[in-house]
C-alpha cells in the first residue's frame, strides 16, 4: 500500500514510525516548511516529521499551501493509495482529498465531535473534561467532520498535564492507525458518522490565555496551569525578594484556603483564587529550568503573586 504521510509536530512522529515499521511504503512526507529559529531568526529549524522522514530516506515536501494546481498535480503524481494526516497544519482542498485511491484518514486527539480543531488536548484539560481519546476518521472538506473509523477513550486524571496526555494519545494513535490501515487493506474498515450533538471547537491557544487570572475559581486556575503545560506554559508575575519577575507555572494541585485573589497563603506557595486555592508545585523562572516548589523557594521569598 502506497502511503503519503502528512504531519508536523512531535505528536505525529510515533504514528509515522509505526507505519514505516509495519512495512507500508511511505512514498512521501508532507510537513510544514522549516521555521526561523535562534535569537536573530537566522537559523531554520525543520519539523520533527521532516527529521524523521529524512532518517528513513523518505522524500519530504514542504509547501506553504496546497491550493495551487501545481502542488495538487505533484500530490496526484505520487499515486498514493491513502494519505495519513496527523497534526499537519494545512487544510486539504478537495483535489487533495480526492487524489488517494482510498481517501485521506486523520488521527485526531479528541472524542469527536467534541474539540474539533487545532488544540484538542489543551482544550480538554482546560475545560476540566474527565475523559478524551484518540480517533481515526476519514476526512471530508469540513473541519474534523468526517466519519469515524476507530476510537479509544482515555481518562484525564485530576493533575494530568497536556504534555502527559499528548504522549499517551500519540502512542494510542500509532496503534489505532496501524489497525485502521490493516482493516482498510482487508476492505473491512467500517465508518460511522459523527453525532450532530455535542460539537465544540478547540481554538488555537492565544498568548493572552496563558496569563493566570487569580480571580477565577481554583479549579479553573489549576486546569489552565496543567492544560498549558509544558507549552506555551501558564505564567504570572511574582514579587520575589522584593523584585517582580515573570514565572511559568508548570504544575499545581488544588488546595484549601481563602483570601484576596493572588494572596500567598503560606510558605509553600498556596495561592488564593477567586474561590478556593491552588498550591504551585513546579515553577520556572525566565531562562531557568522547571523546579519543584521546594527547590524554587530555596533562598527566595515570594511575597505577592500578580
Swiss-Prot record:
Keywords: Protein biosynthesis, Transferase. It catalyses: L-methionyl-tRNA(fMet) + (6R)-10-formyltetrahydrofolate = N-formyl-L-methionyl-tRNA(fMet) + (6S)-5,6,7,8-tetrahydrofolate + H(+). It comes from Brucella ovis (strain ATCC 25840 / 63/290 / NCTC 10512). The keyword Protein biosynthesis applies. One of its GO terms (cellular component) is cytosol. Belongs to the Fmt family. Pfam families: Formyl_trans_C, Formyl_trans_N. Attaches a formyl group to the free amino group of methionyl-tRNA(fMet). The formyl group appears to play a dual role in the initiator identity of N-formylmethionyl-tRNA by promoting its recognition by IF2 and preventing the misappropriation of this tRNA by the elongation apparatus. This is Methionyl-tRNA formyltransferase. (6S)-5,6,7,8-tetrahydrofolate binds at residues 110-113. InterPro entries: Fmt, Formyl_trans_C, Formyl_trans_C_sf, Formyl_transf_N, Formyl_transf_N_sf, Formyl_transferase-like_C_sf, GART_AS, Met-tRNA-FMT_C. It comes from the Bacteria. One of its GO terms (molecular function) is methionyl-tRNA formyltransferase activity. The lineage of its organism: Bacteria, Pseudomonadati, Pseudomonadota, Alphaproteobacteria, Hyphomicrobiales. Its EC number is 2.1.2.9. The keyword Cell membrane does not apply. HAMAP family: Formyl_trans (MF_00182).
Amino acid at each position: 500500500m502506497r502511503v503519503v504521510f502528512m504531519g508536523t509536530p512531535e505528536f505525529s512522529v510515533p504514528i509515522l514510525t509505526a507505519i514505516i515499521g509495519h512495512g507500508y511504503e511511505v512514498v512521501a512526507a508532507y510537513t510544514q516548511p522549516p521555521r526561523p529559529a535562534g535569537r536573530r531568526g537566522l537559523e531554520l529549524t525543520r519539523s520533527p516529521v521532516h527529521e524523521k522522514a529524512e532518517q528513513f530516506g523518505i522524500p519530504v515536501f514542504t509547501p506553504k499551501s496546497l491550493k495551487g494546481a501545481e502542488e495538487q498535480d505533484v500530490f496526484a503524481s505520487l499515486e498514493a493509495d491513502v494519505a495519513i494526516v496527523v497534526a499537519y497544519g494545512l487544510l486539504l482542498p478537495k483535489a487533495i482529498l480526492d487524489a488517494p485511491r482510498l481517501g485521506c484518514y486523520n488521527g485526531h486527539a479528541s472524542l469527536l465531535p467534541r474539540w474539533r480543531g487545532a488544540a484538542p488536548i489543551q482544550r480538554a484539560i482546560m475545560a476540566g473534561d474527565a475523559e478524551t481519546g484518540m480517533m481515526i476518521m476519514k476526512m471530508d472538506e469540513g473541519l474534523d467532520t468526517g466519519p469515524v473509523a476507530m476510537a479509544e477513550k482515555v481518562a484525564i486524571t485530576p493533575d494530568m498535564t497536556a504534555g502527559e496526555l499528548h504522549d499517551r494519545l500519540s502512542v494510542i494513535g500509532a496503534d489505532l492507525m496501524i489497525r485502521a490501515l490493516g482493516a482498510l487493506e482487508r476492505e473491512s474498515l467500517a465508518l460511522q458518522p459523527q453525532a450532530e450533538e455535542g460539537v465544540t471547537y478547540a481554538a488555537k491557544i492565544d498568548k493572552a490565555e496563558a496569563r493566570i487570572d487569580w480571580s477565577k475559581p481554583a479549579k479553573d486556575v489549576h486546569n489552565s496551569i496543567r492544560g498549558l503545560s509544558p507549552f506555551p506554559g501558564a505564567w504570572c508575575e511574582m514579587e520575589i525578594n522584593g523584585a517582580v519577575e515573570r514565572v511559568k507555572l508548570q504544575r499545581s494541585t488544588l488546595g484549601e484556603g481563602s483570601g484576596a485573589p493572588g494572596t500567598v497563603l503560606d510558605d509553600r506557595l498556596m495561592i488564593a483564587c477567586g474561590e478556593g486555592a491552588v498550591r504551585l508545585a513546579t515553577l520556572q523562572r525566565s531562562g531557568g529550568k522547571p523546579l519543584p516548589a521546594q527547590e524554587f523557594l530555596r533562598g527566595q521569598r515570594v511575597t505577592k503573586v500578580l
